Amino acid sequence: MHPRFAKPLDTLSAPLKAALLPMLDNDFQARFTPQQVATLKAATGLEDRALRLALLPLAAACSVAPISKFFVGAIACGLSGTWYFGANMEFAGQGLFHSVHAEQSAISNAWLGGETGISEITVNYTPCGHCRQFMNELSTAKTLQVSLPDDLSALQSFLPHSFGPADLDITDALMSPQAHDELVLESEDPIWRAALAAARQSYAPYSQGYAAVALLFADGRLFCGRYAENAAFNPSLPPMQMACAHAVLCGEDLASIRRAVLLESKNGQISQRDSAQSTLKALGSVELEYQAV
């Protein structure tokens, strides 16, 4: 078990702690399958929403917030019934625009896990405007429920007179299936193959700047991030930030990155190269490998 979970575990009820311990092993992927959720519910007698609220301290324990010291946890409920952790992440000494919000982290975790939408997101603090706009891009934005410790409301109640993809004549949505098979790269290198697969699944209907990052760690594990674009532009989540956030959720130390690659479309209106290099430099790790295809 990752040591970050020790303290929040001690705040949980004995039945919940006992049921969780076998699940929080070194292979924990910051998610609970429907079968694991059923086990936790049976052990505690808690219903879905109450159980997610009880688990929030574990999600918040994944937060990396050296600037704000404000630790936010989120749990996204995928349409498959799997629950996905998320936590905010900041980069020490770097511009705040590099930051990943907890809701973005949880949604990215679900998207990378193969989900095509989420039905509910549970968070320990009310979502900021940035996150509300990010969630309004989702395939399930019209029906998404936001669960807080003292409230359960539809996302749309947080966004009166909202702006979204339809205002820019876009019928696609974040987390809807993507297949940008026009991106082609001949390589037998597993890290580049992973980046290519992720880029083909990225979401960039406004710039066509389909892109993905793949990070290889010292222990041999590989984590990818896809570009997630937004109708309001600024809430878009770059692939480097998504890859870093996912790796941290799964217990990696970003100081142990051994290779980092960025693959993007050569036909996009934008490039992720400078942004990715800047983030990587902040980590003091490796040089960015790059290909536009």
From Swiss-Prot:
Organism: Aeromonas salmonicida (strain A449)
Catalyses which reaction(s): cytidine + H2O + H(+) = uridine + NH4(+); 2'-deoxycytidine + H2O + H(+) = 2'-deoxyuridine + NH4(+)
Cofactor(s), by name: Zn(2+)
InterPro entries recorded: APOBEC/CMP_deaminase_Zn-bd, CMP_dCMP_dom, Cyd/dCyd_deaminase_Zn-bd, Cyt/Deoxycyt_deaminase, Cytidine_deaminase-like, Cytidine_deaminase_bacteria
SUPFAM superfamilies for the chain: Cytidine deaminase-like
Catalytic residues of the enzyme: 103 (proton donor)
Segments forming domain CMP/dCMP-type deaminase: 47-166, 186-293
Keyword Zinc: yes
EC nos: 3.5.4.5
UniProt family annotation: Belongs to the cytidine and deoxycytidylate deaminase family.
GO BP: any one term: cytidine deamination
A GO MF term: cytidine deaminase activity
Entry binding sites for Zn(2+): 101, 128, 131
Protein's name in the database: Cytidine deaminase
Binding note for cofactor: Binds 1 zinc ion.
GO cellular component, one term: cytosol
Primary role: This enzyme scavenges exogenous and endogenous cytidine and 2'-deoxycytidine for UMP synthesis.
Keyword Protease: no
HAMAP family: Cyt_deam
